[in-house]
Every structure is written in C-alpha cells, then in structure tokens.
Amino acid sequence: MRLVLSSLIVIAGLLSSQATAATAPEQTASADIRDSGFVYCVSGQVNTFNPQKASSGLIVDTLAAQLYDRLLDVDPYTYRLVPELAESWEVLDNGATYRFHLRRDVSFQKTAWFTPTRKLNADDVVFTFQRIFDRRHPWHNINGSSFPYFDSLQFADNVKSVRKLDNNTVEFRLTQPDASFLWHLATHYASVMSAEYAAQLSRKDRQELLDRQPVGTGPFQLSEYRAGQFIRLQRHDGFWRGKPLMPQVVVDLGSGGTGRLSKLLTGECDVLAWPAASQLTILRDDPRLRLTLRPGMNIAYLAFNTDKPPLNNPAVRHALALSINNQRLMQSIYYGTAETAASILPRASWAYDNDAKITEYNPQKSREQLKALGIENLTLHLWVPTSSQAWNPSPLKTAELIQADMAQVGVKVVIVPVEGRFQEARLMDMNHDLTLSGWATDSNDPDSFFRPLLSCAAINSQTNFAHWCNPEFDSVLRKALSSQQLASRIEAYEEAQNILEKELPILPLASSLRLQAYRYDIKGLVLSPFGNASFAGVSREKHEEVKKP
C-alpha cells in the first residue's frame, strides 16, 4: 500500500517517461500560477493516488474530489444524497439490491500515460468494485490487498455480486440488507476507475501504475508531482459538468505551521487548508484575507491499545481518562473552534446520543483509582501524527498537554512523533500504548464512524487503532444496518454509544469546525463539512490589490 517516493521527483520520473519534468522546483508553486490558477497550501503526505488504498491523508482529504467521481455525492448544505456518475438509482429487496443508472456522456481524462477511446460505462463500475470485494479478482492484490475503508466495513463479505445489466446499468446484490450502503458509495473511497486504462496496463504488465498514475473522470488530472514539494493539477477539459474555471491548481506541500501562514500572507499561497486555530486573529484582521468556518463531521480522539496490559482493563482506561483536562485542550488547541466530544459521533449526526456524558476532569480521582488498581510507575508511549489534521490543528501540542496531565497522576508519557506516510504501518505493529488520532467522513451515515474505527474487522484494515474487538458491539452495528427505519437505527446506535461509554476503547476529545483561509481575490471556494470539495468552480477575480494597513 505504501509507495516509496524520493524527495525530488516528478510524476514522470516516478511513474512514466512521458510527463515533462519541471526544471525550477523553487518556482513551480507561484511562477505562472496567478494568471492561470491558484495555489492550495496543505500539510500532508502522498502515499498513493488511489483513495481506495488509503485510510486517510491528502488523497482522501483533498485530491480525490479533483481526480475522480463517485456514483453518488452528498450535498454539503442539505446533507442529502445526490446523483453524480449515477443519474438515478433504485433500492430493491428491502435494501439488499441496489441498481444504478449511469450518465451517458462522462469522459475519462486524457493524460500523458493514457488516452481513452470510449466514455464511462458499466464496465468501469464493475471493475472498480470487483477489484475491492472479490479476493480472486486479478487486480485485487495489486499494490497490496488492503482497501482499508472497505475492509473495515467487511465489504467483501457483504457484497454478493456487482454486475453489468447493460452498458449504462449496474446492479449490486448484498448478502443482507444494509441501510448504510448508499452512503458508503458516496465517500471518496468509492471513486470510480477506468477499466480500459487497467486493461492497457495489464497488456504492458504494469498494473502497479493504476494507483500511482491516476486516471479518473474528475475536474482535474495529475500533471506533475514532486514529493514533499507540490502537486500540479491540470484542468480536465472534457469534464462532464463543464470545463473547470481555472486551467491549473498547484497543491503546495512544502511548508507546515507558521510557514504556510507566511506563504498566505505574502501571496505565495492563495488558499490555506486547516489553519491553526491560534492563527485566527491574524487571519481575521488582515483585509487581504477571507476566512470560512463550518461545522465538520469529524472527531479527534485518544485511542488506548486494548491489546496491551494494563490498558486491556476498562477500569484503567477510565482512570486515565479522568486525568485529561479537556477544557484546556479546547482553549489551547482549538481556541473556540471546537466543542468537547462526549461521543464518537459529532453532535451534528442524526444518531448522536443527547444523553452522552463528557468524561470529567478529576486528577485526584484518577490517582485514587490507579492506586486501587495497583498501577504504579506506569510509562506509556503516545504516538502522534506530526502534521495538522482536519480534526486537530496541533497534534504535537495536544500530545504535550496530555503528557503534562498524566504526569500529574504519576503516569509518564513518552511522545513518539510519527510521519503520516508511515503512521498506518507502524501502528499496526501494535507496539504503541496510546494513539492521538481522529476521523473525518464524507458521509452523513453514523456507520461511517462506528465500523471503520471500532469494529473487529477494522483491526486488520488498519483503521481501528485501539485494537478493540467486541462481538456485542459488532452485533448492535449489524442490527442498525438491517433496518431501513430511522427510529430503529437511532435506537441501535444509542446502544452502541452506551457500550463505548462503558468500555472506553477510545476517549473522544473534540469535534472541530472546519477552517479555511484564502486570499481576497479567490471566489467560488466551497468548504464542505465532509471535507473533500471540488475546485472546479474556483476562479480569481481581477481587481486592484488590497494592501495591508
């Protein structure tokens, strides 16, 4: 699943001899971009250009919406399912069969490595999903057999078949009804690939390039990539929704923290994704900048490795949770841009349990409970991502605050910074004690939180960092999926939240607003509560430059 990328390499050198290398890497982000596009500054790593092969990261948070489309989308304002590649669909057999009718004039991108000869059809959808769920499919094991999001849902066990009824109709048959199925197909993990491109790679015996040299139907296509520096996206002129307004977008990967803010202030960046909450005053006071805030479908949490004593004891997990001053996290990390979490679900979720209780901060009680449990001289290793995330703008600072809190109750915490591109592989060796992580979903269905993060299947799919497996909990989740009645599902998810409150495999910390800052002349930028939004409608308004007072 992980790609090994050198530090100075364009997509041509990495994946193909056909693309053109940039000769001046120091100037690529801004040399010609103001006249023909914009610079989007974000912190993150690129492990793959196929969101199906990732559990999170830049491909899921930013790139998938530019490169690919899905059968369905979620409206960022109404939170309802809307058509995308499927112009209509039918739910049959009480939710065990789903039939999709595809749009007839959708073009794949023409790139340096592939020229399509036909439009999107049912073969592409069948190929995309058979590769994921059919373990005997010739493409299933290419670049590893892991499809983290779908593996956590046990997708391969639940999908009986996906078949082409005609050139523009596809039917999924499930082993049992699943009320969340459509919502999972609306995530960016369900991006549709080109079967024709896959066939070309098979003839060349270069199947591994499917996930590295992307070909999709989205508004932009990959033009150039320099690891740790930038990604250049070129407009897909044949995009089915109409030509994107700007010819190119540069995704700047080169700076973190205050470096990205400096680039925004000097005009080297046009858009700053996930600015630190501590920077809000600067952003609000500068007339050259605009700031957008929206509630987000995300959760930041602390995961306890329940495979390792003494963290395998729920009483120890509860005692440690009492030591954490969550109110201080709200003030020092989020600066009023988040609310303390009482559940794995954000409060915006329709299944949120209003009776859920925030874990109290009581260090004295924590010390007493740890002593009663015989816990002394405990040392825990806390693994932390190094870059800002949609759910946590300052993970390392958060870890330092947790470290100080636990020290007050006699627990030594050793912070282990982990770079994003290596985090999943290192976490799966199960040597960590605690993990500071989070989850953002582009689905409004609560199943998008529960199963990927805490189901038994999610352990092997590398998304269950607590390594917690509870058959009763899994049974409740299956009960929720078996009903098309909202009231029944809400009741089941309340039961699931009660189990989590009792067992505490993860400690919910915060549900944050989504933040995005941008230059005054950038128009049409959408900030979705689900994260990944298309850049197709973004433009630059030309007028006299605003000066800082």
Swiss-Prot record:
Mutant lacking the gene: phenotype: More senstitive to protamine than wild-type cells, but not as sensitive as sapC, sapD or sapF deletions.
PROSITE patterns listed in its UniProt record: SBP_BACTERIAL_5 (PS01040)
Secretion signal span: 1-21
Keywords: Peptide transport, Periplasm, Protein transport, Signal, Transport
Compartments where found: Periplasm
A Pfam entry, by short name: SBP_bac_5
One MF annotation (Gene Ontology) recorded for this entry: peptide transmembrane transporter activity
GO cellular component terms, semicolon-separated: ATP-binding cassette (ABC) transporter complex; outer membrane-bounded periplasmic space
InterPro entries per record: Peptide/Ni-bd, SBP_5, SBP_5_CS, SBP_5_dom
Lineage top rank: taxon: Bacteria
GO BP term, pick one: peptide transport
Induction profile: Part of the sapA-sapB-sapC-sapD-sapF operon, RNA detected in mid-log phase cells.
Function: Involved in a peptide intake transport system that plays a role in the resistance to antimicrobial peptides.
Sequence similarity: Belongs to the bacterial solute-binding protein 5 family.
Name by which UniProt lists this protein: Peptide transport periplasmic protein SapA
Organism annotation: Salmonella typhimurium (strain LT2 / SGSC1412 / ATCC 700720)
Organism ancestry: Bacteria, Pseudomonadati, Pseudomonadota, Gammaproteobacteria, Enterobacterales
